[in-house]
Design a protein with these regions (language model features):
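Long, low-complexity, charge-biased intrinsically disordered regions
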Residues: 1-215
Length: 215
């Protein structure tokens, strides 16, 4: 497992297989619709668990029974609990969650995470933009410089990493622009370095948006 985590391309798969083996031993069953969602049902007792790499989110209808179950799991897997999460106004993995049980309304956004990223990259002065990618932008590998500038590459990777996290969770319409620029992570040219800025301008435009719905 240690070699899989740090030395193999198939590390994510090995890690997930390890988690499946441990949690299935303790009654959790992986769902068909989502391999990262597990469910345990014993009579009226229910546990649902979502997995993101090494972060786990549990929901249950019986905290007392869950605590006893969780203690048994820790004998096979070294995990710790961060405590219970109040969904109203809480943040989980940079996701800001607004929950109105009476109205059956749920909204997930990343406005705080985006604001923090904008400050980190020094983009506070930039105007917002209505599109995540400027029209006519086109790069090829021929545009990549022969000499790699490590600092420039690091900045480009960090911008794309942040943008990818937002686009995958709450800003799906930016996915194409992020994926396109990610093709040039190894050696971005100066014009390429400017391209992700447009994505962050778009994030400023849609900062209060997110994923919302009633159920």
């Amino acid at each position: 497992l240690r070699k899989a985590l740090y030395g193999l391309a198939q590390a994510p798969r090995r890690w997930h297989d390890h988690l499946v083996a441990v949690f299935e031993k303790h009654g959790l069953v992986r769902t068909v619709v989502d391999p990262c969602l597990f469910v345990l049902t014993v009579g009226t007792f229910v546990i649902k668990m979502g997995v993101h790499v090494d972060d786990f989110l549990f929901t249950t209808n019986s905290p007392t029974k869950f605590d006893a179950w969780f203690k048994r799991v820790t004998l096979d897997l070294k995990i710790s609990s961060s405590g219970r999460i109040d969904l109203t106004g809480s943040d989980y993995m940079s996701l800001s969650i607004t929950y109105d049980q009476a109205a059956s309304f749920l909204k997930i956004s990343q406005h705080d995470y985006i604001k923090k990223a904008i400050r980190m990259f020094g983009f506070e002065h930039l105007k917002s933009a209505s599109t995540p990618m400027a029209s006519g932008v086109k790069f090829t590998k021929a545009d990549m410089p022969e000499t790699v500038d490590e600092r420039r590459r690091d900045l480009f990777r960090r911008m794309i990493g942040v943008a990818r996290w937002v686009s995958r969770n709450t800003c799906f319409e930016a996915t194409f622009a992020v994926s396109y620029l990610a093709c040039f992570l190894e050696n971005p040219s100066e014009p390429m370095l400017k391209a992700p800025v447009q994505i962050f301008r778009y994030f400023k435009w849609t900062i209060e948006a997110g994923v919302e719905g009633c159920y």
